[in-house]
């Protein structure tokens, strides 16, 4: 596939790795005979490591077929996470090092997860935009003192810590943005 045919979201092979294209910048410099160049911002699958690479319009890249299977988190088997396909209940097992920091957002029975599969092998997951987690430890609200909002740290039931508004108390369920790791509102 030529570089000028590649779109955002395509998965390609490059430098003995597999990468998903997240952003494309097109430039056509006037001084070099008008050769169009493409700069791809891509992330490794699995791993999510960022890579910037530039290509001429007629450079060839090998496209890789990546399937996204909607799944539900089922259980943890040692250091591995097991997800079940929502359609045919195929189990997908991914090691904790592949899941990485996303493990802090995974709770029993979490739905809306997409397992990314290449050649029938699970390689990565894509979490839902937000998840509901429970606050298990946060300091009490300080009365008076200031009219400004002050965030405070809160430890959640999966072990991660986020900053929450002062009015959030222990035992409360909160929405957490999985892309930024920030408080996104009260659940329920």
Curated annotation (Swiss-Prot):
InterPro entries: Elong-fact-P_C, NA-bd_OB-fold, Rib_uL2_dom2, Transl_elong_fac_P/YeiP, Transl_elong_KOW-like, Transl_elong_p-like_YeiP, Transl_elong_P/YeiP_cen, Transl_elong_P/YeiP_CS. PANTHER family: ELONGATION FACTOR P, TRANSLATION ELONGATION FACTOR KOW-LIKE DOMAIN-CONTAINING PROTEIN. GO terms for cellular component: cytoplasm. One of its GO terms (biological process) is peptide biosynthetic process. This is Elongation factor P-like protein. Belongs to the elongation factor P family. SUPFAM superfamilies: Nucleic acid-binding proteins, Translation proteins SH3-like domain. It holds the Pfam family EFP. GO terms for molecular function: translation elongation factor activity. CDD domains: S1_EF-P_repeat_1, S1_EF-P_repeat_2.
């Amino acid at each position: 596939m030529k570089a000028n045919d590649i779109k955002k979201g395509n998965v390609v092979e490059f430098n003995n790795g597999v990468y998903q294209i997240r952003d494309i910048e097109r430039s056509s410099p006037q001084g070099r005979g008008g050769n169009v160049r493409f700069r791809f911002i891509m992330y490794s699958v699995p791993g999510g490591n960022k890579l910037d690479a530039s290509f001429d319009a007629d450079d060839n890249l090998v496209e890789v077929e990546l399937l996204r299977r909607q799944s539900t988190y089922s259980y943890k088997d040692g250091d591995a996470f097991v997800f079940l396909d929502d359609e045919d209940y195929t189990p997908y097992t991914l090691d904790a090092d592949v899941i990485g920091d996303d493990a802090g957002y995974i709770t029993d029975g979490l739905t809306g997860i997409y397992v990314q599969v290449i050649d029938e092998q699970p390689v990565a997951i894509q979490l839902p935009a937000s998840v509901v987690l429970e606050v298990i430890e946060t300091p009490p609200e300080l009365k008076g003192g200031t009219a400004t909002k002050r965030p405070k740290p809160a430890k959640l039931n999966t072990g991660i810590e986020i900053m929450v508004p002062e009015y959030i108390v222990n035992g409360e369920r909160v929405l957490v943005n999985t892309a930024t790791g920030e408080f996104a509102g009260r659940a329920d």
